[in-house]
């Protein structure tokens, strides 16, 4: 018996890769709900053009599909907003989703996507509810998580916080690093390299699939970071990329005045 999976926001970078990953498995029927058309027309997936901020159309679509599983990826993810209202997909869209869930009789599990930017860079949260955003986008994702916690689904559920995910079909801001490398415009600064948690999208969608199809009912372990381990040393990674491109990264020394 096949299972129906809805990817809300399946036309985006992670969503596109997740749909391709799921379609390689048997007994899965995949549906993409997104305001934007899919980047790839994949055999076996079904696209529905829906604005998740419009409750009635979102409700009708999900009710018609009657999914067994949902992965919610839809969001505004850039940092250019001037107010929280600019991130309505991350707030109102999630509120609408939570309103619809009780009407889905076959739903077994939902995974809702947040962001590591619910905490500023370098801040280590003490628990699942410890937030320290430094951007409006991060604040909007705090709202995402709070909406989910305050309207906990009756089925199993989990929240994921992707780190710096890269790979096929990715865009700003993480593509910028690769574009600078290919243009020979990246330089090592000073004598000390930093580390950052990146995640290859192929690994990320595998992690999402594992969370989706495994039990996460422990209320103390509802939030999962998506990314590769261990963290990546930026200098080492830049050197590896430069080697593949056939050149050597130059180092700029700091001048102390």
Feature roles, as predicted:
Residues 5-25:
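N-terminal Rossmann NAD(P)H-binding glycine-rich loop of SDR-like oxidoreductase domains
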Residues 95-136:
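Conserved Rossmann-fold NAD(P)-dependent oxidoreductase catalytic core, especially the SDR/UDP-sugar
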Residues 119-120, 158-176:
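Flexible, glycine-rich beta-alpha linker
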Residues 52-89, 122-125:
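NAD(P)H-binding glycine-rich loop region in Rossmannoid oxidoreductase-like domains
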Residues 70, 81-110, 147:
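NAD(P)-cofactor binding segment of oxidoreductase domains
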Residues 214-255:
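Mid/C-terminal beta-alpha module of Rossmann-like enzyme folds, strongest
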Residues 134-158:
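Active-site Tyr-X1-5-Lys
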Residues 170-176, 190-213, 221-225:
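Substrate-positioning beta->alpha
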């Amino acid at each position: 018996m096949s299972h129906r999976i809805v990817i809300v926001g399946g036309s985006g970078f992670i969503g596109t890769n997740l749909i391709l990953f799921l379609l390689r498995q048997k007994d899965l029927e995949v549906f993409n709900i997104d305001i934007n058309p899919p980047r790839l027309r994949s055999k076996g997936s079904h696209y529905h053009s829906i604005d998740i901020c419009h409750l009635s159309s979102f409700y009708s679509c999900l009710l018609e599909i009657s999914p067994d599983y949902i992965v919610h990826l839809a969001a505004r993810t850039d940092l250019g907003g001037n107010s929280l209202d600019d991130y309505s997909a991350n707030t109102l869209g999630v509120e609408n989703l939570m309103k619809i869930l009780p009407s889905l009789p076959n739903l077994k599990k939902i995974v809702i996507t947040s962001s590591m930017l619910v905490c500023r860079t370098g801040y280590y949260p003490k628990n699942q509810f410890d937030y320290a955003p430094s951007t409006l986008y991060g604040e909007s994702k705090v709202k995402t998580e709070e909406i989910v916690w305050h309207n906990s689904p009756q089925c199993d559920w989990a929240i994921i916080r992707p780190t710096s995910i890269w790979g096929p079909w990715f865009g700003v801001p993480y593509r910028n690093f690769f574009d600078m490398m290919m243009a020979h415009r990246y330089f090592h600064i000073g004598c000390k390299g930093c580390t950052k948690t990146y995640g290859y999208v192929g690994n990320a969608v595998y992690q999402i699939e594992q969370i989706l199809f495994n039990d996460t009912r422990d209320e103390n372990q509802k939030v999962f970071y998506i990314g590769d381990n261990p963290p990546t040393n930026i200098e080492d990674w830049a050197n590896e990329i430069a080697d593949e491109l056939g050149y050597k990264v130059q180092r700029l020394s700091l001048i102390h005045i």
